[in-house]
Amino acid sequence: MKAFYDQQPERLTIDNDGTYVFRWNIEEITEEERTQWQCDEVRCSGNPDIDKVKLAIIRDSYDADREFSIINKYNSHQLGVTVNPDAVDNYTKYLNFLKEIDNILLQGF
């Protein structure tokens, strides 16, 4: 989810309601001589946990049905059950997305 702020937001903010917000891709943008901050963010509950944040980021882009579909189509193609060259491309994009998330989380939590 994209969010906009008037001041640079923190990467991790813990709220009093038992949830926390993790932000990444934080960048300063200037529009009509007004500076704002834009970032991607997800809200999770409980104590801050990298695995929860990773899953929330994945679910922000891929619901479980779509994720399983990509994996199943790739496996079906690899095993020769179906011929679907797009399955390899879609699975590779998905794996690159997961790698990007890992790189984001390695930058700091």
Where are these regions (language model features)?
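A preference for well-ordered globular domain cores
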Residues: 2-109
